[in-house]
């Protein structure tokens, strides 16, 4: 689900796929999984639109660099939808991946929000570390030692600490974090909410990554409508 120029999500591809499936679907017990990142309320709207489909929202938590490993070693399964449908999917997940991986059954909106919480938290973490790196550079602090001391607090976690990042650049790019943080900010505006923390994280990213390389990923990260 790429973003529009204004930051809101564009579900044209997803909607067209469901339209085709709805037209071809002949069985009442088929379950369709949506794994695309969509703002809360989107899946419910699509379920109402395509009432002959049984839709479950099952967000993926894969990184582009280690997608296969992440798929095999999932930390949890989030299933949003009607309980009778999420139960069937959950049973399949347990059969395939074993019973040790938690399966969380919930409604559409909660499942959709969990995915955004995940991506936007890590995007904010990246921006925070970039700001700390700016301070370290200005005051001649040893960045490697600072990170070592910082991460020794087990609550911090070891991910998204590298500045520059794995791509050798500052901030975050790619086809996920930029579109997702913009989408959640745009969605919050529709709800008449102001999110200064997320907005600040996005502003920092625009400063440290002025090339805005995600805008080159047309169709994946952004849709430029005329």
What are these regions (language model features)?
Residues 137-226:
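NAD(P)-dependent Rossmann-like dehydrogenase/reductase catalytic/cofactor-binding core
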Residues 38-43, 121, 173-174:
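Short beta-strand to alpha-helix junction loop
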Residues 47-58, 63-159, 187-194, 204:
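Internal alpha-helical scaffold of NAD(P)-dependent oxidoreductase catalytic cores
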Residues 3, 114-115, 166-170:
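A short, mixed-charge helix-start or loop-turn motif at secondary-structure junctions
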Residues 2-66:
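Rossmann-like NAD(P)(H) cofactor-binding subdomain of soluble oxidoreductases
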